[in-house]
Curated annotation (Swiss-Prot):
This is Error-prone DNA polymerase. The keyword tRNA processing does not apply. The lineage of its organism: Bacteria, Pseudomonadati, Myxococcota, Myxococcia, Myxococcales. Coiled coil: none annotated. Residues 291-361 are annotated as: Disordered. Residues 345-355 have a biased composition (Gly residues). GO terms for cellular component: cytoplasm. It is found in: Cytoplasm. GO terms for biological process: DNA repair; DNA replication. DNA polymerase involved in damage-induced mutagenesis and translesion synthesis (TLS). It is not the major replicative DNA polymerase. It comes from Anaeromyxobacter dehalogenans (strain 2CP-1 / ATCC BAA-258). Belongs to the DNA polymerase type-C family. DnaE2 subfamily. HAMAP family: DNApol_error_prone (MF_01902).
């Protein structure tokens, strides 16, 4: 029996070659280890997108992973650009590889925001490859003599030719040509297999992907498809047989692999953040501050300075009601800094990520000096003087840990970004585990006092965790772009990039692409795709559903294959998008750590790794997130500042930049939330939250914290909601598993809801340090390592035994910990969001017009469409007026009793819908109308057209929307007349023909008017559609939403309405929840799985529903359990678009 040779596969594409490879990186690595390969090189096309996933799996398998990429190179060989595989030999080579991939996507010498190229147009010139060849090994799958000579000149002994043997015509001639060129030019020739799949069974999917890439079908693809399944991973024995005539080719591949010693582990936690440079003696407390970017720091005298923000001393309430608007700092620079590259290292530079990563300890100490001074100033600002003793101790402890771990620059970077936002009047607030940090609180990053709330700092950072911290900051979503561009311009695009998000195939998209590739008709593909929701499992598509769609898998082999292949395709990457807010910022050029490419959105660049990739390598990121509610709150406060009530009003308006001044703990606010009057209120407007509210009956801020946390998948799956509510109602005794745990669980009535409680339980019951408790939480949450979990259990049980807890009791406590450590919600995160719950609820309670107006102007956001927000405002006594070219601004606004006039002090504000509500109307057209109206009101439609230079199309659009107001009160007449008006305001046929006789158009009915409103604006201020159609629904048989509350439990009932929300949460085991709106309110339907399957098309698609079922009552919570549903026949346009959540 012959001994198998050593062999390493050097050319391997994964699915991250985007439609070129048909296997996940993890599958390729696992199969390579199974086959006994000595190493595997992952070389995806123009990218390192999948390399971290492959690296993680290679660590688990113990397989050496070579980092590479297959670049499209222009100018290497005659004709079309050639493919060239580059493999990193060392850290320098890896940096060069990242630079070359970046160059391919961004072009030469990019400094601004490069334009995105189509994937087929991404290429790099050979001159750039030759210039960046150090530390790289080049593998060329060709035999052109001139190209081989050029490669040898550029790479020397670090170049080789690649040959393959796939049993196709003409292949042997190419192998002979390559071997001949190699001998002639002294270049080694290595055997490779140009791998596209990890197993032969994936070849069918590979063919489908090829068809998708070329926009063709399997019947028409021809030679674009591989003729066989030979491009799969093969073991050394199989290749030895295949290449028995050329064993030295296999040896060459193994030798090349031995030369490529770079491993991804080398960049773990490598890059510190760039410093935040502050001039000596220029700290807070009313003293002017200047900060400098790395680019500025490289140029002498490049400093910017502006007057500092005033530091308003204010002692926070027992439980802060809303985020503070200012911070312990000077102002941000007047404008973004230059983005020229420069090496940092000036005095005052912040520290990096630890000495192990090469941090300059002098720089770190300087950074800590700055951070300590800012914390001192911030503590005085937060507490109106010296902080309480317990706060001072906590701050000192946190700062010592931050210094020992080298994270000063991370805190300073986030502080700098938050400071910039506040200096521009952009509302922002930190959340997540960062709210456990007293340092973040006094720096103004977060708004929760963690000491007063008893939060654990180790949930945020611990020495035992060995991972970098993660600070999430929310900004107004409409102004976040200002913050993002500030980061780009301050640190330079070569040192800052947004984290990518990999958009993968889901059920619908997989079905559509596979169906088209297999040649199904567009109708068949459409019917298949409509069978499932976006995120539903294709395994749910059975014969019954296919029959509903007019398809039969038994009769159609292609339908069966479509379903099977679509299931395989689910989870494959389709393209890259932008992460919701993650930024990577580095001291050295970022493109030496990870390739950068332009994002689809202009002005943005992204790295080729997602957040999980960065986490795997312990690379720091800053999360700058957009939050619609912050936009709405900012807009509401600005509206109130402009329409301030009379000074004697009991609901004095807060300062527009100071949510913190909203009155805290208002009983009226809690009473409103307790009756589930929460449409538009942050986090508590969902159907589940509304069902919870009457049972929870919040009475204070901490009740809102619990409300935010309890309606989550974890507590629901853990069965914690009902025990907590029973104990709150006095129907169940409060019990504690171990008496000393009462202080930990008392606030949640003995029911563990928060991750911090799990950590404190381990500290008290087993003597864990807080850092060890956080490690326990992480092990229990992820449960990836049975060994770690077993070790933690042994440590926990031993600690409890030392405290007199018996083995049986200890086992029970461990089971409880295991049960809720993973699903528990972070208390700090819930508290941060609860601030916004209270602030938005206060505005809704006391200023419903301003609140509704702000919500309309902040769309898209929240749970409900504009129509539902308008109906809710009307139920709260707000007068709403429709779109009118004579009164409306571009956005919705507040006006007084006189149309188009601002409300006088003390006058009740009226909500005027803005021109932005008219579907399809460009903002430029709206602005032109406003500019023309500023010179005086319009006297006629012709004058409007002439002065605003409106085209006939836009005039007709406005007329259809009923927006011509007093100029043409009758909508039909307005549309008719608009069709005969030219852009200059004259009649189209004036002077060419006798005057047209007046046309007596029939008056539109109320139903026609409402239908036209919905068709053109998505909402109607005239009335609800159900009020118009109810008289024809059979008298009192069909109940209104308001009447449901008076019916007894299990009473048979029929209800009808407009579908405003559909939900099918994963935790509901197939149950669908539908919210129906009528003229009196909202009715909640519960559609069980069997009913849903029978009426799936109606439930999923009908805009209006008539439902029959029985009343389900639980206290004040009323639902309708549905037995059957039917579409309610109304005009197709008469309805808003439902918000569907799957």
């Amino acid at each position: 029996m012959s001994h198998a040779p050593r062999y390493a596969e050097l050319r391997c594409k994964s699915c991250f070659s985007f439609l070129e490879g048909a296997s996940h990186p993890e599958e390729l690595v696992g199969r390579a280890a199974e086959l006994g390969l000595s190493a595997l090189a992952l070389a995806d096309v123009n990218g390192l997108y999948g390399i971290v996933r492959a690296h993680a799996e290679a660590k688990r398998q113990g397989l050496p992973l070579i980092v590479g990429a297959e670049l499209v190179v222009a100018g290497l060989a005659p004709g079309r650009p050639a493919r060239l595989v580059l493999l990193a030999q060392d850290r320098e080579g890896y940096a060069g590889l990242c630079r070359l991939v970046t160059r391919a996507h961004c072009g030469e010498g990019w400094t601004g925001a490069p334009e995105r190229r189509e994937r087929d147009a991404v290429a790099v010139p050979f001159e750039a490859v030759a210039a960046g060849a150090r530390g790289l090994f080049a593998l060329y799958p060709g035999a052109d003599g001139d190209a081989v000579a050029r490669l040898k000149d550029a790479f020397g002994r670090r170049a080789a030719l690649a040959v393959t043997r796939h049993r196709v015509a003409g292949e042997e001639a190419r192998v002979l040509a390559a071997r001949s060129a190699g001998r002639r030019l002294g270049v080694p020739v290595a055997v490779t297999n140009d791998v596209h799949t990890h197993a032969r069974a994936r070849q069918v999917l590979q063919d489908v992907l090829t068809c998708v890439r070329h926009g063709t079908t399997v019947d028409r693809a021809g030679r674009r498809l591989f003729p066989n399944a030979e491009r799969t991973l093969k073991g050394p024995e199989e290749l030895a047989r295949l290449w028995s005539d050329f064993p030295e080719g296999l040896a060459a591949a193994a030798d090349i692999a031995d030369q490529c010693r770079f491993r991804m582990e080398e960049i773990r936690g490598e890059h510190p953040l760039p410093p935040v440079v502050v001039e000596r003696g220029a700290l807070a407390g009313g003293v002017e501050v200047a900060t400098s970017s790395p680019a500025q720091a490289a140029r002498e005298g490049a400093r910017t300075a502006t007057p500092s923000l005033s530091l308003r001393a204010s002692l926070p309430a027992e439980r802060p009601a809303a985020p503070e608007p200012e911070g312990p700092a000077a102002s941000a620079p007047e404008g973004p800094a230059s983005s020229e590259p420069g090496e940092p290292g000036l005095a005052g530079a912040g520290g990096g990520t630890g000495a192990a990563a090469g941090t300059d300890r002098d720089g770190a100490l300087a950074g800590m000096s700055l951070l300590r001074e800012l914390v001192r100033e911030g503590a005085r600002w937060r507490y109106g003087g010296e902080p309480p003793e317990d706060v001072a101790r906590q701050l000192a402890r946190e700062l010592d840990l931050v210094e020992s771990l080298g994270y000063a620059s991370y805190f300073l970077t986030v502080w700098d970004v938050v400071r910039f936002a506040r200096s521009r009047g952009i509302l922002c607030q930190g959340r997540g585990s960062a709210a456990n940090s007293a340092v973040c609180y006094v720096l103004g990053i977060t708004s929760i006092d963690p000491v007063r709330m008893g939060l654990l700092f180790e949930r945020f950072i611990s020495a035992e965790r060995g991972e970098p911290p993660d600070i999430d900051v929310d900004f107004e979503h409409e102004r976040r772009e200002e913050v993002l561009q500030y980061v780009y311009q301050r640190y330079g695009r070569d040192r800052a990039g947004m984290v990518c998000e990999v958009i993968t195939y889901r059920g619908k998209s997989a079905l559509r692409d596979v169906g088209k590739a297999l040649g199904l008709s567009l109708g068949q593909v459409d019917r298949l795709a409509k069978l499932i929701g976006t995120y539903e499992d294709l395994g749910q598509v059975g014969p019954e559903l296919l029959a509903q769609a007019g398809l039969d898998a038994a009769d159609s082999e292609r339908v069966r294959m479509t379903l099977a292949l679509a299931r395989e395709l689910q989870g494959f990457p389709r393209h890259l998008s932008i992460h919701v807010g993650g930024f990577v910022i580095t001291r050295r050029p970022l493109c030496e750590t990870v390739p950068i490419e332009p994002a689809a959105m202009p002005g943005r660049t992204i790295v080729q790794w997602d957040k999980d990739d960065l986490s795997e390598l312990d690379l720091l990121k800053v999360d700058l997130l957009g939050l619609g509610m912050l936009t709405a709150l900012s807009r509401a406060l600005a509206l109130l500042a402009r329409h301030r009530p009379a000074p004697a009003s009991p609901t004095a308006v807060p300062h527009p930049d100071a949510l913190a001044t909203i009155p805290a703990e208002d009983p009226e606010v809690y009473e409103m939330l307790g009756r589930a009057d929460s449409i538009g209120v942050f986090q508590v407007e969902s159907r589940a939250q509304m069902s919870l509210a009457p049972r929870l009956r919040p009475r204070n801020f901490y009740d809102l914290v619990i409300s935010v946390a309890i309606i989550r998948p974890g507590p629901i799956q853990g069965g914690m909601i009902h025990p907590y509510l029973r104990r709150r109602d006095g129907k169940e005794q409060v019990r504690y598993p171990y008496a000393p745990l009462e202080p930990v669980l008392a606030r949640t009535l003995g029911v563990p809801l928060f991750q911090e409680q799990a950590m404190r339980l381990a500290v008290i019951a087993a003597g864990f340090t807080p850092g060890e408790a956080d490690e326990l939480r992480r092990v229990m949450t992820h449960r990836r390592s049975h060994e770690k979990l077993a070790a933690m259990k042994a440590r926990l049980v031993a600690g409890m035994a030392e405290r007199g807890i018996s083995g049986a009791d200890a086992e029970e406590i461990f089971k409880q910990l295991l049960g809720f450590a993973g699903y528990g919600f972070p208390e700090s995160h819930a508290a941060s969001f609860a601030l916004l719950v209270y602030a938005s609820a206060w505005l809704k309670r006391y200023h419903p017009a301003a609140f509704a107006c702000a919500l309309l102007n902040s769309q898209p956001m929240g749970f409900y469409a504009p129509h539902t927000l308008v109906e809710d405002a009307k139920r709260h006594g707000v007068e709403v007026r429709g779109v009118d070219v004579g009164c409306s601004g571009w956005e919705s606004s507040l006006e007084g009793a006189a149309p188009g006039r601002p409300a006088a002090p003390g006058e009740t504000a009226v909500l005027r819908v803005g021109l932005h509500a008219v579907r399809g109307l460009p903002r430029a057209v709206g602005e032109a109308i406003l500019e023309a109206r500023a010179a005086g009101p319009f006297g006629s439609v012709a004058e409007l057209v002439r002065r605003a230079r409106l085209s006939r199309a836009w005039l007709v659009r406005l007329a259809e929307a009923g927006a011509l107001g007093a100029l043409a009160p009758d909508r039909r007449d307005a549309v008719w007349r608009s069709l005969a008006v030219e852009a200059d305001g004259g009649d189209l046929f004036a002077g060419l023909a006798p005057p047209e006789p007046e046309v007596a158009l029939p008056a539109a009915s109320a139903a026609d008017e409402v239908s036209a409103d919905f068709a053109t604006t998505g909402l109607s201020v005239r009335g609800h559609p159900m009020a118009l159609v109810r008289p024809g629904l059979g008298g009192d048989r069909i109940r209104t939403a308001r009447e449901l509350g008076r019916l007894p439990d299990r009473a048979p009932v029929e209800v009808a309405g407009l579908v405003i929300v559909r939900q099918r949460p994963e935790t509901a085991r197939g149950i669908v929840f539908v919210s129906l709106e009528d003229e009196t309110g909202i009715a909640n339907l519960v559609v069980m799985p069997d009913v849903y399957e029978r009426f799936r098309p109606v439930v999923r698609g009908a805009p209006f529903l008539l439902a029959r079922g029985r009343v389900e009552r639980s206290g004040k919570v009323v639902n309708v359990r549905v037995d059957s549903v039917a579409p309610l026949a109304l005009a197709p346009s008469m309805g808003a678009r439902a918000r569907d959540f799957h």
